[in-house]
Amino acid sequence: MKVVYDDVRVLKDIIQALARLVDEAVLKFKQDSVELVALDRAHISLISVNLPREMFKEYDVNDEFKFGFNTQYLMKILKVAKRKEAIEIASESPDSVIINIIGSTNREFNVRNLEVSEQEIPEINLQFDISATISSDGFKSAISEVSTVTDNVVVEGHEDRILIKAEGESEVEVEFSKDTGGLQDLEFSKESKNSYSAEYLDDVLSLTKLSDYVKISFGNQKPLQLFFNMEGGGKVTYLLAPKV
């Protein structure tokens, strides 16, 4: 098994978010894609990653290969990577994985392939009341600003706008609408409002680097879904349960 991806920063951004949620995870290298699904320690959030083989510079996978790893350890490896460097992940043995950071100098890491117990996660089919495509940078700024004053982020949807805000002693409100330019598209069935953990949203803000826009979907008493559609066909989905 051997795959090469041109920009190591993409994997770094994904693992950075993942490391905030779980201690261990499994990357599945299949014939047509690399996949990862992980449920956080408290079973409040879930992250799903699909990177099709077309995104990779090289992709040589004949049989499914599972790479179990410690997220913090892998993050330490990826931190040595610089801008525009590539990453090669290869294995000739089920017990270990070779990670090469390829740039002006090549760095090779021999990583033990861990036996990670995989949780049975049922297929989730949710019907949302609102789906909106908004600027990733705008979403990141909104969550960063709101999370500085509250533990709960309120997400509110109307027919023509999305609001991300803090309520209570300190009030902050960020509006996304077509008038302000932060809202690209909006699918609306009814007005909705929910509270979500500011900490859990702040933990995954590195995902906003994956695409210019993020599709957020939610509804009354329903999870918040963040969907990042990457250049080249990659997809990253993050689900977060509402506060009760």
Swiss-Prot record:
Description of how the protein assembles with itself and partners: Does not individually interact with either of the other PCNA subunits, but is recruited to a PCNA1-PCNA2 heterodimer; does not form homotrimers. Heterotrimer which circularizes head-to-tail (head is at N-terminus, tail is at C-terminus) to form a toroid; DNA passes through its center. Replication factor C (RFC) is required to load the toroid on the DNA. This subunit interacts with DNA ligase, RfcL, XPF, and weakly with DNA polymerase I.
Pfam family, one: PCNA_C
Keyword DNA-binding in record: yes
Protein name per UniProt: DNA polymerase sliding clamp 3
TM stretches of this protein: none
Gene3D superfamilies assigned to the protein according to its UniProt record, in alphabetical order: 3.70.10.10
Gene Ontology molecular function: any one: DNA polymerase processivity factor activity
GO biological process: leading strand elongation; regulation of DNA replication
NCBIfam families in alphabetical order: pcna, PRK01115.1-3
Gene name per UniProt: pcn3
Keyword DNA-binding: yes
Highest taxon of source: Archaea
Family, per entry: Belongs to the PCNA family.
Physiological role: One of the sliding clamp subunits that acts as a moving platform for DNA processing. Responsible for tethering the catalytic subunit of DNA polymerase to DNA during high-speed replication. DNA polymerase I, DNA ligase and the flap endonuclease may be constitutively associated with the PCNA heterotrimer forming a scanning complex able to couple DNA synthesis and Okazaki fragment maturation. Heterotrimer stimulates the Holliday junction resolvase Hjc.
Keywords: DNA replication, DNA-binding
Entry-linked HAMAP family: DNApol_clamp_arch
